[in-house]
């Protein structure tokens, strides 16, 4: 057993209001610069829908993640090393800019400087890549916002597998949900295996996956290898970039920017201990529907003295062990089992988990489409949302999702009985395998949690990872990553790089 610690995140989709504050603040901090205009390290999608980039979940098209071979081993879906090298100059699995969207701005100055006309002046769109006029905006990162667009296009959502989507199409307002997405910082990241340059690595001390900008050569195999399509190519610098989990803030014990600014307070951050020796075993199970339970099995109980002793021997510091004891992520994923990984069938063992939304169940119950099982709506009779959520979160296995939804409904029924009727009904908790105290704890964390309850982040011990004395005087003030400016001035063929300038409209 090799104990490692990871900063993990849980997002409670039951509280997400789709305001995109997380996306905008992340964009302003990390990707508001040349070459990354189209990139959103954090974006919020409306489901059902094909998402951003288009059909990112369709691995038959993009070949992201891992696949299990006949001998029981796993390899990246894009192929073994020889196939990666064979396609290194012509990658057939690479999304194009139109699969994301062509970033644009508007001729705002025309509004100020236009001469007097009979009609109001209009700010027309212009490409941020070429600087040319765009006649029509074709797509965007939230194009399907609130079920926007035709159902014929949104029905390509792969989570409709096994779902009667024709019935959903007739009643397409039956349910919708918001899905905020960011890099999963997986335990078994496919992007690390796909990179020919070895530029991507997973930090041992906190599990954050990063790209070494000095090693990156822009081969973009990582873009294909990532099944969540959360690595972006910077066309200006010639490097790949991704969500860095705001590691400078994490090291200081502060939450990520998206978590800090979340209006709905849906995000939770905490430490999870896991057995690094069992990662391959968990990712290689034969049945995809067993991957969720396999990942749970490698998480280690921070209350176990044997685990704590081994963690200390493996270099996990005391403040991290104390944080693991108070981790809200551990409580939701392991104690209450109401949080689930996004598409575990990709075999990457993702570490950003989601609490499924109750809105489809409550909407159906209020409209009389499903009955009540005692105090709670009958979750299992609502086939379409349940199967859809199972395809999204547990590789199609409905039982864990149904139990998680029932426990959240039980929490509501229990607290309603306690606060409105003044009756503490333990039978509600017992029906879903909990007790009254666990329901109270769930309510405290998931409904009214304080800041320090949602974000249990220990400070980093950088002194254990590098010798600062040896680095003295090696780097002055610089912009970018370390001593690297983050830009490559000559282009691929040696001539000076041409910066795109947005032309002014002259009248």
Q: Each predicted region: which residue ranges?
A:
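Non-ligating segments of multi-cofactor redox enzymes
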Residues: 1-507
